[in-house]
C-alpha cells in the first residue's frame, strides 16, 4: 500500500536507488497504490552516470509491497520491501534489467516486458 510521500526502492538498473511517491495515478481521489499500479515519483537517491538523476520526476510501476495482497484463490502475497520499476510513457521499463522477484499481478495488468525481465514471478 503506497501513498504520497512513501519511499520505494528501485528494482532496475536505471541508476536510481530510491524514489518518493508524489502521486498515485488512476483517479482524482485515489489514495493508495498496490502491486501493478502506476505512480508518479521523484528520484531521491541515484548513482552517478545513471540514465536518471536525482530530482527527476518519473513514472513507475509498483512491483513489491510490504502490505499483503489477497489473491483471487484466497492466498496472500507480501514482500520484505516496497519496490518499483521506472517506466517510459508506453509502460515499457526504462532499464534493461530487473532485480528481485515481482508480483504475478503485473502479468494481469499487461506489464509483460517487466515480467519477462524479472528473475522470478511470485
From Swiss-Prot:
Q: Which InterPro entries match?
A: Ribosomal_uL14, Ribosomal_uL14_bac-type, Ribosomal_uL14_CS, Ribosomal_uL14_sf
Asked if the Swiss-Prot or TrEMBL record annotates the protein with the keyword RNA-binding, the reply is yes
Question: What does UniProt give as GO cellular component?
Answer: cytosolic large ribosomal subunit
Sorted UniProt keywords: Ribonucleoprotein, Ribosomal protein, RNA-binding, rRNA-binding
Coiled-coil region(s): none
Q: Name one GO molecular function term.
A: structural constituent of ribosome
- GO biological process terms on file: translation
* Keyword ATP-binding attributed: no
Q: Which family does it belong to?
A: Belongs to the universal ribosomal protein uL14 family.
Quaternary state and partners of this protein? Part of the 50S ribosomal subunit. Forms a cluster with proteins L3 and L19. In the 70S ribosome, L14 and L19 interact and together make contacts with the 16S rRNA in bridges B5 and B8.
PANTHER family from the UniProt entry: 50S/60S RIBOSOMAL PROTEIN L14/L23, LARGE RIBOSOMAL SUBUNIT PROTEIN UL14M
Its biological function? Binds to 23S rRNA. Forms part of two intersubunit bridges in the 70S ribosome.
Would you tell me the protein name for this molecule?
Answer: Large ribosomal subunit protein uL14
* Lineage per the UniProt record: Bacteria, Bacillati, Actinomycetota, Actinomycetes, Mycobacteriales
Amino acid at each position: 500500500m503506497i501513498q504520497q510521500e512513501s519511499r520505494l526502492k528501485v528494482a532496475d538498473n536505471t541508476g536510481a536507488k530510491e524514489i518518493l511517491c508524489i502521486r498515485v495515478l488512476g483517479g482524482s481521489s485515489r489514495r493508495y497504490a498496490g502491486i501493478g499500479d502506476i505512480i508518479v515519483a521523484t528520484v531521491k537517491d541515484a548513482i552517478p552516470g545513471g540514465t536518471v538523476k536525482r530530482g527527476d520526476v518519473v513514472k513507475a510501476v509498483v512491483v513489491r509491497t510490504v502490505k499483503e495482497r489477497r489473491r483471487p484463490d484466497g492466498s496472500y502475497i507480501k514482500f520484505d520491501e516496497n519496490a518499483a520499476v521506472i517506466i517510459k510513457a508506453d509502460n515499457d521499463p526504462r532499464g534493461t534489467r530487473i532485480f528481485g522477484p515481482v508480483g504475478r499481478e503485473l502479468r494481469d495488468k499487461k506489464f509483460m516486458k517487466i515480467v519477462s525481465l524479472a528473475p522470478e514471478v511470485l
